[in-house]
């Protein structure tokens, strides 16, 4: 199976859902990380080198949008979103199209994550039979996660080692701490958030979650709740429609945000 991961920024490939990507990789699936941007122009060379090394360590194929999309707070977000749609569409329509798309939720608070999430949504909605979409959240929350990936300390160390390649970003904000802390917290909360309150706890020290949505007969349906089976990761979706949530305005549009 070919997995397309969409990164608004370099380092998102190792912060959004890294344990899930690595579990899929280890099961023999081919993971491609599409980096939409390289941050501010002055940082392009550094961040290109960092994401190249990070993907080498993680054993992900890397594709970088050329030229990188400008999606910082002061940039033209409409243009950025249009370019993101075009780039994702090109990846979808290539000689080897993906069987699964993974990327940010359109409600992930950070403007660049949200525009990338909307771009994924819009591109998939134009396809007759698009692949499933697994959404992660870094700055926001997933109100109804559907899929849990559990992992151990060894996997956590592997994620940290790959994320350490993003030297400049880790010096600014150490997301290795973020990923570790989130994994420990999610191991406690995931079972009840995915399977219902009162569900037994996971037998794991670390976990991460994504929300799966599947486009069927012109409607978005929520994925089936489950623990990831990397060898057979896809499943028939539920009959629960989630298009109203996917298409709803971001809370940023209602109350603003720290970058507005």
Write out the residue ranges for each language-model feature.
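Active-site beta-strand->loop->alpha-helix modules in alpha/beta enzyme cores, enriched
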Residues: 1-132, 222-226, 231-260
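The feature marks non-catalytic terminal segments
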Residues: 54-58, 129-260
């Amino acid at each position: 199976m070919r997995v397309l991961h969409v990164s608004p920024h370099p380092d998102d490939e190792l912060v959004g859902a890294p344990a899930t990507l690595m579990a899929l990789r280890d099961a023999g699936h081919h993971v491609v990380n599409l980096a939409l941007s390289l941050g501010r122009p002055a940082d392009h060379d550094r961040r290109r080198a960092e994401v190249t090394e990070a993907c080498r360590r993680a054993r992900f194929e890397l594709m970088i949008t050329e030229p990188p999309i400008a999606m910082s707070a002061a940039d033209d977000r409409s243009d950025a979103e249009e370019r993101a749609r075009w780039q994702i569409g090109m990846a979808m329509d290539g000689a080897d199209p993906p069987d699964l798309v993974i990327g940010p939720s359109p409600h992930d608070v950070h403007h660049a994550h949200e525009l990338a999430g909307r771009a994924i949504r819009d591109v998939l909605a134009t396809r007759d039979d698009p692949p499933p979409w697994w959404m992660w959240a870094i700055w926001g929350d997933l109100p109804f996660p559907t899929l849990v990936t559990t992992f151990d300390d060894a996997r956590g160390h592997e994620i940290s080692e790959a994320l350490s390649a993003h030297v400049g970003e880790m010096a600014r904000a150490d997301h290795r701490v973020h990923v570790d802390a989130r994994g420990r917290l999610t191991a406690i909360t995931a079972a009840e958030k995915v399977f219902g309150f009162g569900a037994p706890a996971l037998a794991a020290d670390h976990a991460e979650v994504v929300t799966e949505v599947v486009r069927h007969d012109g409607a978005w349906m929520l994925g089936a709740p489950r623990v990831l089976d990397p060898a057979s990761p896809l499943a028939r979706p539920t009959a629960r429609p989630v298009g109203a949530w996917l298409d709803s305005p971001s809370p940023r549009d209602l109350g603003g945000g720290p970058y507005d």
